[in-house]
Amino acid sequence: MKKLPIFLLICLLIGIVACKETEDYWTQYEQWRETNESWFIEQLGAKDEKGNPIYTKVVPSWDHSIYVLMKYYNDTSLNRDAQSPYQTSTVDVIYKGMLYDGTPFDSSYLRTDSIYRTQVKQNIKGWIIALEQMKVGDSC
């Protein structure tokens, strides 16, 4: 019976040590943040060979403090009358996620079925913003 309090004390000490904060994430990822922000600013001003912006800055109506950069690979004027999904819509997406330096980090092509079916609102904010902006048939 005397072993139970000692066991509980050891568990408490392990819990305290395990929960100790080691480093502030803001400081830990400072270099990554600065590189990422520099890339975004550079891309906002990037132009193609005809002088047109390469990326479109998209700010959602529901939060003006965030935005995404979208690069369309198709002629969006051809899909102008097509439907856009709502946050409650279910969409089929084929995607390849890449870091700013072109390093791939995720892809639907790595799955058995390359189509990723999801409800728009179940994704990260960047995807929600982009998907709500896209029309059926768009490629970004």
Regions found by a protein language model. Give the residues of each.
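Sec-dependent bacterial lipoprotein signal peptides
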Residues: 1-19
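Cross-family detector of peptidyl-prolyl cis-trans isomerase
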Residues: 19-140
